[in-house]
Regions:
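N-terminal amphipathic alpha-helix/helix-capping segment at the start of soluble metabolic enzymes
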Residues: 70-87, 178-186
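Short beta-strand/loop segments at the ligand-binding rim of alpha/beta enzyme cores
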Residues: 81-87, 189-195, 263-273, 345-357
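Glycine-rich beta-to-alpha transition loops that act as phosphate-gripper elements at the mouths
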Residues: 90-93, 197-201, 272-276, 352-365
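Glycine/Thr-rich beta-alpha phosphate-binding loop at enzyme active sites
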Residues: 234-250, 284-285, 289-351, 391-393
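Glycine-rich phosphate-binding active-site loops on the catalytic face of alpha/beta enzymes
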Residues: 112-118, 296-303, 361, 367-393
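Active-site entrance/lid segments in N-terminal catalytic domains of soluble metabolic enzymes
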Residues: 2-17, 30, 34, 96-292
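Glycine-biased, low-complexity coil/linker segments
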Residues: 45-47, 68
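C-terminal helical cap(s) of enzyme catalytic domains, especially alpha/beta-barrels
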Residues: 122-137, 308-323, 383-399
Length: 399
């Protein structure tokens, strides 16, 4: 990997990264092409569109994908033309400064960090630690005893890199993220797509119907930014001990029905964690794609593990943080497995949906492995954080 400083600085808080980032090569990319700002524009914008007399942003002109050499002509992501169906998933791109820098570094899919219908705080610092599985290749196996016994986590960031992801899905309030998302959308170049991510927010005393409605409200708020597609996160919301929203396919199906009523024909992708049962995974597909509410799945997010320090104590401070999602090199095998199983279900059921492969992509070979497994598009978070040139390397490898 390259020697670039990570564009998200793990030595600083989420709040500091939001205000001061991105860093490293991403920061240099923004300096190389100064943004054009105006008084009523977002403080985090890249290259905003023209403003109308009323202050509203005009829709940018249609941008034509140029295509990456070696890729099939007419590559798309949920119907939108892309140069290369590769980018960065929800997580490290905190605002439009980050997404704009990602575009300029050649990542043609840039996912705006998951937003909510309300402001939501971040877990205490630190949020990211280096994770060191025991296996020779550094991989974690879903369901293995190691995940419950404890995996070493510290500040020794070694290659191949695996890290904790313990943020709690923070969000700005809509009055902050909506104008910033508009600017992020406008900053996309030809063949590039801003991918908004969202999730519902469960608060104390909320009924299931209110929880479903909160998803629909957040999707509507994204639609108001002019987004042409969106991803709904079902891989983080905690529905109980070690139980995620995506472990309840029938509820996800009900939620996507409500979301689709709000967004209409705008394509919807659902983000999944690792689902070990083929029957449960097929039920997820039948409950969503089978009802016409979902056009794709993005998988995987992380693998949950108990993280410990060298003395066997809880690595991340605070109540309820004995476990964390792990991402990076450690989860590539699980990600490839999920993609291949989803592709097999797609073939079995004869349903048309897209698969976005995520997890442990740190090299051009990893990108190709996901495509070979059945992914229509691929994204990298940890790999991209530690190698800002990753998209360019993948494009150079395709002949």
């Amino acid at each position: 990997m390259s020697d670039f400083e990570p564009f998200y600085d793990v030595k600083h808080s989420y709040e500091d990264n939001y205000e001061q980032g991105p860093f490293g090569a991403f920061a240099e990319a923004l300096k190389a092409t100064p943004s054009v700002t105006s008084g009523d524009s977002s403080p985090y914008e890249g290259e905003p569109g023209k403003k109308t007399s009323a202050g509203a942003e005009e829709k940018p002109e249609e941008k034509t994908a140029v295509g990456a050499e070696g890729e099939p002509a007419g590559s798309t992501f949920l119907g939108q033309p892309v140069n290369l169906p590769f980018g960065i998933p929800a997580g490290p791109l905190l605002n439009s400064r980050f997404t704009t820098a990602a575009f300029r570094m050649g990542f043609d899919l840039a996912t705006y960090k998951t937003v909510r219908s309300r402001a939501w705080g971040c877990n205490p610092f630190p949020n990211v630690l280096a994770v060191h599985p025991k296996s020779a290749d550094g991989s974690l196996i879903p369901g293995s005893a190691e995940l419950d016994e404890g995996v070493l986590a510290d500040t020794n960031y070694e290659q191949p890199i695996s890290i904790s992801n313990s943020f709690g899905v923070p969000s700005q309030s809509p009055d902050v993220w909506q104008p910033d998302m508009r600017a992020a959308i406008a900053a996309a170049g030809p063949g590039q797509v801003l991918v908004p991510s969202f999730q519902g927010s469960r608060v104390e005393g909320m009924s299931e119907e209110e929880y479903i409605a909160d998803h629909a409200t957040t999707a509507r708020l994204i639609k108001e930014t002019g987004a042409k597609l969106m991803v709904m996160n079902t891989s983080c919301p905690n529905e109980g001990h070690n139980r995620l929203l995506c472990h309840n396919p029938l509820l996800v199906g009900r939620i996507t029905e409500a979301v689709k009523q709000e967004i209409g024909d705008i394509p919807l992708m659902v983000k999944l964690a690792y689902i070990p049962s083929d029957d449960d995974l097929e039920l997820m597909v039948r409950s969503t794609v089978g009802h016409g509410t979902v056009q794709g799945f993005s998988t995987i997010n992380t693998i949950s593990a108990k993280l410990v320090d060298a003395d066997g104590n809880q690595a991340l401070p605070g109540a309820g943080r004995d476990r964390s999602g792990v991402c990076g090199n450690a989860i590539r095998g699980a990600g490839l497995d999920m993609v291949a199983r989803l592709a097999a279900i797609r073939e079995k059921l004869g349903l048309d949906f897209k698969i976005n492969g995520v997890g442990g992509v740190v090299s051009p070979a990893d990108y190709q492995a996901y495509r070979n497994a059945g992914a229509d598009s691929v994204m990298s978070a940890t790999g991209a954080m530690w190698d800002a040139e990753l998209a360019r390397k993948i494009k150079s490898s395709i002949k």
